[in-house]
C-alpha cells in the first residue's frame, strides 16, 4: 500500500459486505472457538505453547540474522514483503490488482481454477508480510504499517470470499489446503493482535471449507499428501481457535497415512509413492507428505495430541526406502516429480531442498542412529551439489536454511558418500542405479502407472516421459543436465533412452487429468541389490508403436536392448541413445569410432555401422552389434509457457547433442543394442568396444532379452515369453538375474513383472549342491546337475523380486 489502509476504515467504506462472485451473502455470525469454561485453565497455555512451536517451525530458529546466508535471505524477505505492502490495494474482488479472485462465472473450469488460485495467492502474500514483520533483520521487523496491512488484508479476504457464505469454486485445493494453511500460518504469527471476533470468523471459514466430513473416508482427495495437508489445515485451525476437538480429530485422522498400501495413493513396501491413483510422485506430493507429517510430528510432540501410532515407524522407514534412493548429490530425480518438472523457477535441485530440511526435522524425533545416518546423508548431498548448493538457493526459506546450516556446522557429522546399490520400485515402474561416481534412473509406464500426468495446464509435453526415459548424472559433472531450462527446450520426442514414434501429439495428449495408461502388464524387473535387470513392454501413447525394452545395470555401465519395435503409424520410430543438454554455449567434442566430428551448430550425420561414440566430459557409448547411428547438434528455443500455462513466455535457447537410431517409417521387429558408460573417457570407451569378450548378448528378440558378463559372474534374462536362453529356462514370462560369487555360492533372483504367474518354474543348467536360503514363494527346489526352482502363485507378490541363495558344485 502506498499509504496505510486502516482496517476498520476500509471495512466501513466497503460496507463490510462480501462481493457476490455469483454467490450470495456475507459471513454468518459464528460462536467463538475459545476453550469452554469447564476445560482446565492450562488449556489456553497449552495452545499458546503450540502456537509458539508452530511459529518456530514457520520462521526457523537457532540462526544469527547478521550471518550469511540468513542476512541476505532476511533482506530478500523484507524486499518481497515491501513490494506486497506497496502494491496492496483492497478493492471489490481483490486485495492486489494482479490477484483478482472475483469469478464472474464460478464453477470448476480452467478460468475458475485461476480465480481461486488468486485468492490463495493473496493469503500467501499476507503470510510473507507477516513473516517479514515477525522476523529480525528484514527492515520491516515490528513495523506497525505492515502489521496493520496484514490485519486489513485478512479481514478483506474473509469479508469478500473466504467465509461461510461463499461456495467453493475453481480448484478445491485452494479452498481446503492452500488458503487455510496460509491463513492459519499468518494467524499464528500475529495471534496476539487478533480480536476474538476475527479468530472466530477466520476459524469458521476454515470449518466451512474443510468440514469434519473430509476425514470420514480415506478416499478421493483425502488420501496421501492431501490427507496430511487437510490435517494440517484443521490442526492449525484448532490451535488458533483453541478447539481441542478439532486438534484431536485431525491428529487422529493422520493414521491412515502411515501404513503401506497395495493399491492407490500412498507409500508402498518397496518404497514407491503414488498420488492421483497412478502417478509416481515422491518428488512432489511425497515431499509434501513428508514435510507435513514431519512438521506435525514436531508440533504435537510432548502435547496431549502427540502421535504415538506405532505405524509412524513405517513413515520414518520411507526415508531410506523411498526418499534417499531418488536423491543424488543434492537433487531429487525428475522422474518422480511429474507435473512439477514443468514449473518455472524450480528444478531437481530446488525441489530437493525441502526434502533435505524435512529429513533434518523428522530426524529429531527418530531413533538416534536414524537421525545420525540421515544428517550424514544430508551433509554429503549438500557438500557435493556443486551446481546449485542448497544454501545459495535464492528461494530458500529461513526455516530450511536454519535446518541445513545446523547440519553443515555440526562437526560431529561426517558426510556420507553415495551408496553403491540398485533399487527396483516395482509398484511405480521406476528403477535407480547408484555408483560412487554416477547415478541413473529409468521411467516406464504400464496398466498400473500412467505415461504421464497433465493437469492445471502443467506438463503439456511430458507424454513420452514414461517411454523408457533413462536419466543419469555424474558426481563431478552433469548435475545441471535436467535443471538448466531442459524441459521447455528439449525435443519431447527425443528424451534420453526412449523409443517413440514421431507421430505428432497434441499438448496435453490424453486429456486434462487423463493420466493415460498403456494396456501392458510386463513392466518391472529384478535385482540383487547391487545389479539389476529391468524390462518394459512399451506401447506408445496414442500410437501403434510396440517395443520390448531392457536395461541391464552393471558396475560401470548400463546395457540397453530393444527388440520387436513395430509400428503402423505412418511415421518414423526412433530410439534416442542420449540427448545431452549443453547449456547456452556448450560444444563438447563428439568422437565416433576414433574420429572427431564437427562442432558447429546445425551439423548432423548418420554413421552406417558405428561401433562406439564419445561425448567429451559426458559419457561413452558402445554398440556391440554395430549401429546405424545418427548424431545432430542443434540449438532449440522454447518457453516455460509452452509446457505450463503458468510459466513466462520469454524465449530460451539451449544447445543439444543428440545420438539416436532411426528405425524407419513403420518398422517391423526392429532392434537396437548399446552400452552407456557414464563419465568414461574416449580411451576407455574404445577399449570397451574392442573387448569382444566382455559382454555377451544372449538374446535380443520380442521373446527374450538377456546378457552375460563373465567378469561380474552375471547372467540376466528378461523372458517376455517362456523359453530357454543360454543356461536359463523359464516356464512363463519372468525376469531372472543370477550372480556367481567367488566364495562358491550364487544368488538367483526371480520376479514376475506381469503379475500373472500362478505357477512358474525356473531352471539354471548349472551344477548346484545345496539351496542355502529361499523365500516362501519357492514351493520346491531340486539340485544336482541343474537347479530347478518351482514357484507358487506369484500374483500376490506384485512383481517383487524373490531371492534364492545356493551353493555351487
What label would you give each PLM region?
Residues 1-5, 21:
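Secretory targeting signals
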Residues 9-31:
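N-terminal export signals
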Residues 25-48:
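C-terminal segment of N-terminal export signals and the immediately downstream linker at the start
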Residues 43-80:
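N-terminal mature-domain "stem" immediately C-terminal to a signal peptide or N-terminal signal-anchor/transmembrane
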Residues 88-344, 348-349:
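Aromatic-lined, polymer-binding surfaces characteristic
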Residues 296-311, 315-759, 764, 768-770:
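Extended polysaccharide-engagement surfaces of secreted carbohydrate-active enzymes
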Residues 673, 788-809:
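C-terminal beta-strand-rich structural cap/linker in extracellular carbohydrate-active enzymes
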Residues 776-780:
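Small-residue (G/S/T/A) turn/hinge positions that recur once per unit in extracellular repeat modules
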Amino acid at each position: 500500500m502506498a499509504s496505510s489502509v486502516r482496517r476498520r476504515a476500509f471495512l466501513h467504506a466497503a460496507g463490510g459486505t462480501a462481493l457476490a462472485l455469483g454467490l450470495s451473502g456475507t459471513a454468518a455470525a459464528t460462536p467463538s472457538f475459545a476453550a469452554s469454561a469447564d476445560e482446565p485453565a492450562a488449556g489456553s497455555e497449552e495452545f499458546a505453547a503450540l502456537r509458539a512451536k508452530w511459529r518456530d517451525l514457520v520462521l526457523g530458529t537457532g540462526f544469527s540474522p547478521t550471518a550469511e546466508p540468513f542476512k541476505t535471505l532476511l533482506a530478500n524477505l523484507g524486499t518481497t514483503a515491501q513490494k506486497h505492502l506497496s502494491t496492496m490495494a483492497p478493492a471489490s474482488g481483490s486485495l492486489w490488482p494482479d490477484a483478482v479472485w472475483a469469478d464472474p462465472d464460478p464453477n470448476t473450469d480452467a478460468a475458475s481454477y485461476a480465480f481461486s488460485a488468486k485468492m490463495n495467492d493473496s493469503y500467501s502474500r499476507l503470510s510473507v508480510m507477516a513473516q517479514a514483520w515477525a522476523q529480525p533483520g528484514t527492515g520491516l521487523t515490528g513495523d506497525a504499517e505492515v502489521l496493520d496491512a496484514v490485519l486489513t488484508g485478512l479481514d478483506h479476504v474473509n469479508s469478500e470470499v473466504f467465509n461461510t457464505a461463499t461456495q467453493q469454486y475453481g480448484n478445491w485445493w485452494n479452498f481446503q489446503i492452500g488458503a487455510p494453511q496460509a491463513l492459519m500460518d499468518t494467524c499464528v504469527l500475529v495471534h496476539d493482535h487478533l480480536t476474538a471476533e476475527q479468530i472466530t470468523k477466520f476459524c469458521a471459514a476454515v470449518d466451512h471449507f474443510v468440514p469434519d466430513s473430509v476425514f470420514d473416508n480415506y478416499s478421493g482427495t483425502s488420501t496421501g499428501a492431501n490427507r496430511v495437508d487437510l490435517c494440517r489445515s484443521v490442526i492449525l485451525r484448532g490451535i488458533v481457535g483453541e478447539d481441542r476437538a478439532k486438534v484431536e480429530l485431525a491428529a487422529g485422522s493422520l493414521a491412515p497415512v502411515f501404513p503401506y498400501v497395495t493399491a492407490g495413493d500412498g507409500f508402498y513396501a518397496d518404497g514407491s509413492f503414488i498420488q492421483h491413483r497412478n502417478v509416481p510422485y515422491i518428488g512432489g506430493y511425497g515431499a509434501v507428505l513428508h514435510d507435513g507429517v514431519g512438521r506435525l510430528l514436531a508440533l504435537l510432540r510432548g502435547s496431549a495430541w502427540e502421535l504415538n501410532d506405532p505405524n509412524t515407524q513405517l513413515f520414518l522407514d520411507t526415508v531410506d526406502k523411498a526418499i534417499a534412493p531418488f536423491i543424488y548429490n543434492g537433487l531429487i530425480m525428475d522422474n518422480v516429480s511429474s507435473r512439477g518438472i514443468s514449473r518455472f523457477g524450480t528444478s531437481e535441485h530446488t525441489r530437493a531442498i525441502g526434502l533435505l530440511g524435512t529429513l533434518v526435522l523428522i530426524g529429531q524425533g527418530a531413533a538416534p542412529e536414524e537421525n545420525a545416518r540421515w544428517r550424514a546423508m544430508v551433509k554429503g548431498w549438500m557438500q557435493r551439489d556443486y551446481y546449485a548448493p542448497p544454501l545459495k538457493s535464492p528461494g530458500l526459506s529461513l526455516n530450511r536454511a536454519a535446518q541445513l546450516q545446523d547440519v553443515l556446522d555440526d562437526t560431529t557429522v561426517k558426510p556420507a558418500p553415495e551408496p553403491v546399490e540398485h533399487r527396483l520400485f516395482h509398484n511405480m515402474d521406476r528403477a535407480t542405479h547408484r555408483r560412487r561416481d554416477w547415478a541413473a534412473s529409468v521411467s516406464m509406464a504400464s496398466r498400473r502407472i500412467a505415461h504421464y500426468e497433465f493437469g492445471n495446464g502443467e506438463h503439456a509435453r511430458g507424454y513420452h516421459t514414461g517411454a523408457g526415459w533413462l536419466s543419469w548424472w555424474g558426481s563431478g559433472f552433469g548435475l545441471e543436465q535436467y535443471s538448466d531450462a531442459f524441459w521447455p527446450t528439449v525435443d519431447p520426442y527425443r528424451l534420453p533412452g526412449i523409443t517413440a514414434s514421431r507421430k505428432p501429439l497434441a499438448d496435453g495428449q490424453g486429456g486434462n487429468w487423463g493420466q493415460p495408461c498403456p494396456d501392458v502388464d510386463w513392466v518391472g524387473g529384478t535385482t540383487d541389490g547391487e545389479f539389476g535387470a529391468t524390462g518394459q513392454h512399451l506401447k506408445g501413447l496414442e500410437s501403434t508403436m510396440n517395443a520390448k525394452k531392457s536395461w541391464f545395470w552393471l558396475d560401470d555401465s548400463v546395457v540397453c536392448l530393444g527388440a520387436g519395435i513395430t509400428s503402423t503409424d505412418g511415421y518414423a520410430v526412433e530410439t534416442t541413445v542420449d540427448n545431452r543438454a549443453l547449456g547456452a554455449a556448450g560444444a563438447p567434442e563428439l568422437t565416433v569410432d576414433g574420429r572427431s566430428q564437427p562442432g558447429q551448430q546445425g551439423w548432423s550425420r548418420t554413421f552406417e555401422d558405428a561401433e562406439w561414440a564419445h561425448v567429451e566430459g559426458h559419457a561413452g557409448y558402445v554398440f556391440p552389434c554395430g549401429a546405424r547411428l545418427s548424431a545432430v547438434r542443434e540449438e532449440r528455443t522454447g518457453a516455460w509457457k509452452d509446457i505450463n500455462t503458468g510459466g513466462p513466455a520469454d524465449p530460451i535457447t539451449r544447445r543439444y547433442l543428440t545420438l539416436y537410431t532411426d528405425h524407419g517409417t513403420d518398422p517391423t521387429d526392429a532392434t537396437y543394442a548399446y552400452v552407456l558408460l557414464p563419465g568414461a573417457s574416449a580411451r576407455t570407451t574404445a577399449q570397451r568396444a574392442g573387448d569382444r569378450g566382455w559382454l555377451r548378448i544372449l538374446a535380443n528378440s520380442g521373446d527374450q532379452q538377456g546378457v552375460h558378463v563373465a567378469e561380474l559372474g552375471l547372467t540376466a534374462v528378461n523372458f517376455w515369453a517362456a523359453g530357454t536362453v543360454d543356461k536359463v529356462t523359464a516356464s512363463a514370462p519372468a525376469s531372472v538375474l543370477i550372480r556367481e560369487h567367488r566364495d562358491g555360492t550364487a544368488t538367483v533372483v526371480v520376479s514376475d513383472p506381469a503379475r500373472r504367474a500362478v505357477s512358474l518354474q525356473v531352471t539354471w543348467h548349472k551344477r548346484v549342491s545345496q539351496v542355502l536360503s529361499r523365500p516362501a514363494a519357492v514351493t520346491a527346489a531340486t539340485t544336482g546337475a541343474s537347479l530347478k526352482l518351482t514357484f507358487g502363485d506369484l500374483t500376490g507378490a506384485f512383481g517383487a523380486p524373490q531371492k534364492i541363495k545356493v551353493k555351487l558344485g
